[in-house]
Amino acid sequence: MSGVIVIVAYRPKPGKENKLLKLVRNRVPTLKKENLVTERVPTIMRARDGTIIEVSEWKSQAAIDAAHKNPNVLAMWNKFFAVCDCVSLNTLAEAKEMFAGFEPIAD
């Protein structure tokens, strides 16, 4: 069984960046408690427009599918929806660059 690396872009709603960062930092620990992600440390960064990007690893596609039925994960995602919109990577200016660079966000 191989892992699945995902890249997610969270565009904060006005005035919600700090709440979003707190949720992003707690996302993988929450998913670990549910045994859905690997031990890989996520990479969190910021695009020029303020969008937060996270790279993390699920245990498998089955784990991703299970998350969509897990009440703890669904509750976490509802908190995300209150403070951000998930956007496609191609909406970021950096995605048009050969070597997309982002600002690292410390833990």
Predicted feature descriptions by range:
Residues 1-4, 45-48:
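Short, flexible turn/loop "capping" segments at secondary-structure junctions
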Residues 10-13, 47, 92-94:
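Short, flexible beta-strand-to-coil junctions
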Residues 26-41, 57-94:
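An amphipathic, aromatic/His-enriched active-site/gating alpha helix that lines ligand/cofactor pockets
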Residues 92-107:
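Acidic/histidine-enriched, glycine/proline-rich intrinsically disordered or flexible terminal extensions
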Residues 38, 48-51:
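Short acidic/glycine-enriched loop/turn segments that link adjacent beta-strands
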